[in-house]
């Protein structure tokens, strides 16, 4: 499904990657959100850092494609990628296995992390209180059929940036394969290894990502500009050197 002709200002904020596949770089932390549209549904990749951002993403994606969002894939359980999820009523939410348990157990830490990074305390508290957890845990690979020959592969490529890293891959007729990487790949800054990262496993996660996407895919980092396979390989090697693994 292609973007609609009259989509107001939304079209200017979303980058077209392939027919029916777009992404937007959100203000603040330069986090990526994506959308993939088929004839029978629309899948959104990540939901931003607040309910306000989630509402804006939902509205703009519907302006771009017409049908409402039906599926969400959360690439990892960090505040800037999940706190808008409650703005999408009635959708099917996917995450790497264990992500839902972590988000359920560590709500206070999620809220504190958001506030530490500059989210207003009341905004963070509201989003965490209403947070929608993934209904569908992905332990290996799972295909979501959006109709009209659009099939989205959800792949648990972690651990790496976190213990629960999910990649989203789609190949549509007339376009390149597109890989939404989450924060296992970052372009606008050094990859961030927080206290929940598994540094020694991270290079292997990128090996899995490259094996799935291949040399000709378009790779969409969790933060920053779109990159190619060679960039991902260089980042993989830099992480291996940084963390002392082969």
For the regions a language model picked out, list residue spans one by one.
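Divalent metal-coordination and catalytic microenvironments
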Residues: 20, 36, 46, 61, ...
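Active-site metal-binding motif and surrounding structural segment of the metallo-beta-lactamase
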Residues: 52-95, 211-218
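Binuclear metal-ion centers of metallo-dependent hydrolases, dominated by the metallo-beta-lactamase
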Residues: 228-246
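Short catalytic-loop micro-motif centered on adjacent basic/acidic residues
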Residues: 23, 43-46, 70-73, 153-154
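Conserved beta-strand hairpin/beta-sheet module of binuclear metal-dependent hydrolase folds
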Residues: 11-59, 166-183
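Metallo-beta-lactamase
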Residues: 16, 41-43, 49-51, 101-156, 207, ...
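Short, acidic/turn-prone active-site loops that include or flank metal/cofactor-
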Residues: 49-50, 97-101, 185, 244
């Amino acid at each position: 499904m292609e973007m609609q002709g009259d989509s107001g200002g939304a079209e200017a904020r979303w980058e077209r990657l392939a027919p029916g596949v777009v992404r937007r770089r959100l203000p603040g932390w330069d986090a990526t959100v994506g959308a993939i549209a088929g004839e029978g549904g629309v899948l959104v990749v990540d939901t931003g850092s607040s309910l306000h951002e989630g509402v804006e993403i939902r509205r703009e994606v519907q302006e771009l494609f017409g049908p409402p969002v039906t599926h969400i894939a959360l690439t990892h359980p960090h505040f800037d990628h999940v706190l808008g999820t409650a703005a999408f009523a009635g959708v099917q939410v996917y995450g790497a296995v264990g992500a839902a348990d972590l988000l359920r157990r560590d709500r206070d830490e999620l809220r504190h992390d958001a506030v530490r990074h500059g989210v207003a305390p009341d905004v963070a508290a509201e989003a965490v209180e209403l947070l929608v957890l993934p209904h569908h845990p992905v332990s290996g690979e799972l295909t979501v059929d959006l109709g009209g020959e659009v099939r989205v592969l959800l792949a648990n490529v972690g651990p790496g940036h976190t213990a629960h890293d999910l990649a989203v891959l789609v190949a549509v007729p007339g376009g390149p394969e597109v890989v939404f990487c989450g924060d296992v790949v970052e372009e606008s800054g050094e990859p961030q290894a927080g206290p929940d990262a598994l540094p020694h496993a991270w290079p292997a996660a990128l090996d899995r990502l490259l094996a799935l996407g291949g040399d000709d895919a378009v790779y969409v980092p969790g933060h920053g500009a779109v990159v190619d396979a060679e960039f991902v390989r260089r980042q993989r090697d830099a992480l291996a050197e940084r963390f002392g693994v082969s």
